[in-house]
Structures are given as structure tokens and as C-alpha cells.
A protein has these predicted regions:
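Carbohydrate-active catalytic/glycan-binding domains of CAZyme proteins
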Residues: 1-174
């Protein structure tokens, strides 16, 4: 998959969508179509930049995307703000899935609300401005106590200095 921004600069354009393309040589690509399109009237109406989840992370393994409960999964940055990374509005982390063939273009299903938000009661200062890219791994050994580990980065303002900072966070899911 790849993410498409439809503007030329940081504030023009609507935002991100996620498309799929294929290549035989990594130099020449054929666009196949969208997998996360704009959704008018939803929390993520202008931003839907996706990142496929559950790759096989075994060293020397297949690196193929694994299924869970018969579905492929993808997290994405979503929001209603327009422009590059919605500079005037927060981004949140959404979740999408499909039971279909991930090598063909088709719209993936999405949740009606984000799975990670600046409004979450346990959000720390560095998560309260916006949230960015996320990646989910399936740790079948539950090294951190849960099988699903999401790494994500987020931004916020320090409560004492008011300086903007970004951090990488870890979220766990059972």
C-alpha cells in the first residue's frame, strides 16, 4: 500500500488516502486503486493514511501480512482536518480490516471511532496534540504481556515549558 496526499503544499488539498500499487521491479508501478477513501461525515473524513498491520516479523521469514480472525488489519492516521498531516486539526489512530484479497483494490471496512485519541482519559501530555503513524505487530509469545503491540508516535505540548515534543509510544491489546 501507499499513502497519497492530494495537495501540493502543506495547507492545500484535502488530506491522505491509502491506495495499492504493484511492481515487478520496484521501479515501475501500476496503481490498482484505493483501499481507504475519504468518508464524508465521519471522524476521518479528510485523513485516511494507512499502515498494514501484523507482518510476519520472523528474521528471515516471509514478512507477509498475517490474518487474525480471518481478516487482514491496518491502522491509519485519520481526522477531519485538511492539509498535510492536518496541521490545523488533530489526527487520531483508526483501525480498518478486510476479509478480501489484499492484492486487489477494494474499500476496507473501518471502525466508527478511533482506537487511539488525544481525548483518551489516559493520554499523556505528549499524546494530546496529535497522533501520527502506527505499526501493529503480533507477538505470539506475549513478551510484553499481550499478543498485539502497537508502536505509534504522537505530539503534544509539555505542561511546564509549553514546548512541542513528540514521542514514540507502545500500546498493548489482548
Amino acid at each position: 500500500t501507499y499513502v497519497v496526499y492530494n495537495g501540493k503544499g502543506g495547507t492545500d488539498g484535502r488530506g491522505y488516502e491509502t491506495w495499492i500499487a504493484e511492481s515487478d521491479n520496484l521501479l515501475e508501478w501500476r496503481t490498482l486503486g484505493r483501499v481507504l477513501s475519504y468518508r464524508d461525515g465521519k471522524w476521518d473524513c479528510n485523513q485516511r493514511g494507512g499502515f498494514p498491520a501484523l507482518p510476519d516479523m520472523e528474521w528471515g521469514g516471509s514478512y507477509e501480512l498475517q490474518t487474525y480472525k480471518g481478516r487482514h488489519w491496518m491502522t491509519y492516521i485519520g481526522g477531519e482536518g485538511t492539509g498535510y498531516e492536518a496541521v490545523k486539526a488533530p489526527l487520531y489512530v483508526g483501525l480498518a480490516w478486510t476479509k478480501g484479497d489484499i492484492s486487489t483494490a477494494h474499500e476496507w471496512e473501518s471502525m466508527d471511532k478511533p482506537i487511539l485519541s488525544i481525548h483518551d482519559k489516559d493520554a499523556q501530555w505528549w499524546e494530546k496534540l496529535t497522533q501520527y503513524k502506527s505499526t501493529v505487530y503480533w507477538d505470539k509469545d506475549k513478551t510484553l504481556g499481550a499478543p498485539f503491540v502497537m508502536y505509534y508516535n504522537a505530539g503534544g505540548r509539555h505542561p511546564e515549558t509549553d514546548l512541542k515534543g513528540e514521542r514514540v509510544g507502545i500500546a498493548l491489546s489482548k
